[in-house]
């Protein structure tokens, strides 16, 4: 982009250079000696054009005219050119186009005796075949009817077309870039051969320097008669009527003025004819007009230079920014270099030093630009000061009659000096412009060097040395130009002396003195009139001063009367102030009483305001308690911060309130319809930390130690930060820990603080659901789904006692978890992760036991296949993930609408979450939100799902705490049941049943009598077995069925899929479990109960347990099979740890 900009700028500069450069052939001055004949010949050949001609030449040049085959070098060898005399006219292309001349290019060849001018003539078919502007064109004196000028020389003149060569050097067109030395030589040649000649040959009709170029008829105005000019009136009037002076070069106009001055000097009377005087005045006006146009041209050139300087400064800034780089790019590059390129730090230090060196060179270049700018501005100021000083001097000197002649001569000198100075300034501006262009090229080279600095350091050093050499050559060229300018100034001084002598003679004319005298008389009259006018004004001022004195005296009297009136008013005010003070004292007494009353009221209001926050917190607690009683799922929303490189301004989150309000903006809808408001239990901003998030869920996690079941799961689209919230980043520090680590750490800390009263045991399980398969992440068992049912892994449970144990287990589980990269997330979780924490506590004083479970679920993110760009296995994973999440949505919808049927069996995820979503558990859901605009549709679906979840009522949570009275009731119930059985058997014996039944009943009675004989031992064994059985069932991982707390649901003899008790005892692999739904014992929706009702419930429960235990211990039930939930006994591999 920068290269294209530099190219456009270079093209613009070349165009402006073509506008400002006079088209002069470079090869004309190479073979010319400094004698009078060659000087006259070069003056004849040099094309001096005015601004109008330069504009026309620009039109011709911009057409990009191709050079024809006839545009070859006009070369005459040195041997043949000694006797050749060319009498042809040289014109510029603009003049030829103005006159519609037939242009015939000639190619000089060897001469013959018959035809000394033997030329190869070829014609151009159209003006488009002309050679480039600035080349010399030979016109035939026969075919060209226009007047022509002869040129005689004994040396060969080389007029080359672009691309030709002469003398071992490559000629170039006037617009081709040249070296500083070539421009130096060109400036010397221009300053040497374009000066006016002091002799009378300047007025020679054969020289174009004294005539108007382009075929004007001004050369016919003078005719040589007896060594002087005879001015013809007809020719002068023809020149006055035509516009020939407008197109004439400045040198020709000056030559006309010099000729007229010489003619007046030669005449005796010193008078000028009226027509000649008019012509002279018109020529002077034309010169003044050109001076003004040249000054305007310099102003425009100055503005162009200023614009270019601003562009150069902007480019330098761009180069500096490219060298330094933005802060964000530096940060990203540093992070990459620290990981991948640690070995290259030393090289980077060297590169930074070189960048500093380059920055210093950029600053030096900028200083040079500023110095050149200041020098140019000083030159412009000097020129303007000179012009102002000259005009001021003319106005001052006109006032004095005696110095009028000297002033006129000085004015004439100033005019001529201005013309020369303007021409010099134009040349100097061209030189400065070329220097600036060279510096721009050097800056462009420097830009290329900075881009390739990392690859070629040595090449850059060489280029820098070349750059220094070029700057030295530029400085030498500038010094040479300054010397040339000094020489040109000396030459102009010599010319000025000759012109001053002529002007002194001209100033002796009588007409000018008469005009000066008349002007002085007129000014004297004006001065006298001014004196009379000022005297009258002085009288008027005296009258006005008298009137003002009278008015001031009247004002003084009025002020005195006003002061006396004010004194009387002050006395009255003093009297009024005393009365007001008395009234104020009375009012103050009243106000003190009222203020005391207001103070008491303010104290009451202050107390109320102080208690306001306490009331708010109490209301919030009551609201939370109400939510717990209702059993609503708590919903916490967390907004993910933007990643590096993402625009924070393009967010869908409009507002985050302090009380759970969230306003989302739809970027596709304007106005009020674009805003959508949601309300949750808590909303976390992107700036929230992990500690702030965990502080709000601490009470929920601590309730696990009180015997409650708690479930926390994270929901959201892929890449929204679910794993970060639940687990934290890879290699996280203690500050970056997620909910999993912090929850277990908090449980350990509280268990240690309560160890004097309650003894806790904590176990951890970690499984995942991958493609509808339940896999154990801690043991490495990967089971597959069979055709006839679901294969449940032996989920191993490890006891943990410290945070280090948890970190070790979590690292193993995260390594085994399925993670892959997609287009939306570099580390996308491809499975649902479930961390289950089992807590068992025993009260050391009362002996009561409590059980609590904590499920920490990290759901896989929902994703769109077209955005994630997944194929193959990743596509299959995404389909299973979306299917399970849609099943979760169906379950939430059924629970929200309180439907009679809840489809838990549609997915393994909903089966595992059944105890948390459909049971008496405390459930919390983290909603992770991606604030990017591109994820607006996924964010809205996530928020709508969370809003639906917040309305689900699960009922009040219930603690699974068993006291000592419950165990005593169970023992009493078993004793009473056995007594009833004995009495029943005795009754059957008395009724005289058949012998078969009698024997069977007697066998049973003998067994029961033996059991009754050792009743205390059997009761203890039953209670211990029941205790261990319920413990194992609570710590098992189900295959989708509810973790029911009732024993009736755990012991169902009529289930289809079952596991043999011997298999469970020996640790063999379990059989398949049917996928058919099993009945779950319905729960009561009552939140509170009386003690009597509670006792009845406990007795009914104990009777059911006693029946189950008796059935298990009876001899006829030895072959009986246990229910499917019994297959979930924790049987880990041999190397896994076990609870005793």
Swiss-Prot record:
Keyword match ATP-binding: yes
Comp. bias intervals (Polar residues): 197-209, 1002-1018, 1099-1130
Record has Cell division as a keyword: no
PROSITE patterns: KINESIN_MOTOR_2
Keywords in alphabetical order: ATP-binding, Coiled coil, Microtubule, Motor protein, Nucleotide-binding
Record region (Disordered): 1-37, 50-81, 161-217, 323-347, 1002-1021, 1028-1140
GO annotation terms (biological process): microtubule-based movement; microtubule-based process
GO terms under cellular component: microtubule; microtubule cytoskeleton
Residue stretches making up the Kinesin motor domain: 632-952
A GO MF label: ATP binding
Residues the entry annotates as binding ATP: 716-723
Biased composition (Basic and acidic residues): 1-12, 180-193, 332-347, 1066-1078
Biased composition (Low complexity): 161-179
PANTHER family the UniProt entry points to: KINESIN-LIKE PROTEIN KIN-14O, KINESIN-LIKE PROTEIN KLP-3
Protein name as it appears in the record: Kinesin-like protein KIN-14O
The species this protein was found in: Arabidopsis thaliana
